[in-house]
Amino acid sequence: MSLLTTVLLLWGFTLGPGNALWLDSGSEPELRAEPQSLLEPWANLTLVCAVDLPTKVFELIMNGWFLSQVRLETPVLSYRFSLGAITSNNSGVYRCRCGVEPPVDIQLPALSKWTMLSNALEVTGKEPLPPPSAHADPVSWITPGGLPVYIMCRVAMRGVTYLLRKEGVDGTQKPDVQHKGTAGFLIYKPGNYSCSYLTHAGGKPSEPSAIVTIKMSATQLPPSLCLMGSYLTIYPQKTHETLACKAPRNAAEFQLRQGERVLNIQGFSPTRDATIYYVNLKELDNQSPFTCRYRMHKYMHVWSEDSKPVELMWSDEKLPAPVLTAEPSSHNLEPGSTVQLRCTAHKAGLRFGLQRQGKPDLVVVQMLNSSGTEAVFELHNISTIDSGNYSCIYMEQAPPFSGSASSEPLELRINGPAPKPRLEALWKGKVPLGHEAIFQCHGHVPRVSMELVREGFKTPFWMASTTSTSAFLKLSFVGPQHTGNYSCRYTALSPFTFESGISDPVEVVVEGS
């Protein structure tokens, strides 16, 4: 795996629906509408499914149901599906997908023979025309005297005229940039914006897009600083730690700091909005937390806010191992209770770390500085997912920062069933045909993989890894066949192996089912 791929995975990723979980086909296809005449866009309409890599197989799907499939003699980059005049019989939400052919003669699993679904394209056959999509790029905030941002508007129909409106202001704004089906509007002032489009000068504007809110921020918002690998591991031969700083937009310069002191460490930038630092642990002269910040092109006199701090810990294992004890006893603990893990050393003024055994790594899950000879770590509202082997370690708070070996492991056993997450439906009533049904799964611990499961089915319908305690899950293209009861669950990301219970179900009812 490349370093850039590792960074992108570290900052969060989302897997597609169940029929594409094992696919790595590049990019999803594009579906666009090509009317015979923009004066009467619904009189004779053709849908074009275009893909980056040539293929022989194209499939058109309407309202979540398969509609048409073509198999060609030779691979092409696009295929045209003629709908003709739009009536109640062929109006709806369309998507397409394309067949994937491996570069060598291998047998793919059936579900891996397709690309992801294309963008959704709404065909109504009436006016006003369906709304475009809109979003802020690269961020949804501006600073006084700072760089503007764009509002990007898109509709899957070429040749239209885009208009932007600001709430409370008469008149419209024309695009500053436009390419294929997307238009960009430069935004210098905060406010609520929406865009629409015209197919011809005498036509009616389309339905407006969803509101895009641009806020004013006093300073550039902070970047995120994270440890490569998600968890901190300690072993005596370790000499370097890797930190990644990511800004919310492209930056001219980054700084890695301890307190107010800028560290003289040259970073490597895989992208314009990120820098990776290799920190030599042997060259550090203090244990202060690390932060990072950035500044923008043309605004080099203004630094962003600092990131949240990241603490490091390391050990040469030259000092005696501490002793770890549990209060109450580590066996037969009750769910929902609190357990105290006491780490005791032979000297005072140390930094202590609580470690948990993964597979195969022993990782640091908490750190505490102590002026005495011990530190007390607390695990609150414990459940079966906290069961496992724990140990502790310490290091001196002054150079040369010698440290101990890990204590003898202590096993925690928590009784009871695994905790259940909570699944929340982010819509009301019935789900319209061809639209998305978006859920939020609320768990108990960060760094997990969450799954959307349906009653009676073994394969998840959606998966998402998250560094927080919740994640968005969805049915991306709802048809009548999606009516049913859905739940969520989560499993630990490596190196841990716990699994939650199943949430209470949420019923999905689809219009027309």
Swiss-Prot record:
GO cellular component, one term: extracellular region
Domain Ig-like V-type: residue ranges: 22-126, 127-219, 220-312, 313-415, 416-513
Chief site of localization: secreted
UniProt-listed SMART domains: IG
Record's signal peptide: 1-20
Keyword Secreted listed: yes
Pfam families listed in its UniProt record: Ig_2 (PF13895), Ig_3 (PF13927)
Subcellular location: Secreted
Sugar-modified residues: N44, N89, N192, N369, N381, N389, N485
Tissue: Isoform 1 is expressed in normal liver. Isoform 2 is expressed in the regenerating liver after partial hepatectomy and at very low levels in the normal lung, brain and testis.
BP terms from Gene Ontology: growth hormone receptor signaling pathway; immune response-regulating signaling pathway
Kinase as UniProt keyword: no
SS bond list: C49-C96, C153-C195, C245-C292, C343-C392, C441-C488
SUPFAM superfamilies (UniProt xref): Immunoglobulin (SSF48726)
Record's keyword terms, sorted: Disulfide bond, Glycoprotein, Immunoglobulin domain, Repeat, Secreted, Signal
PANTHER family membership: ALPHA-1B-GLYCOPROTEIN, MHC CLASS I NK CELL RECEPTOR
Subunit structure: Interacts with CRISP3.
Name recorded for this polypeptide: Alpha-1B-glycoprotein
Organism (species): Rattus norvegicus
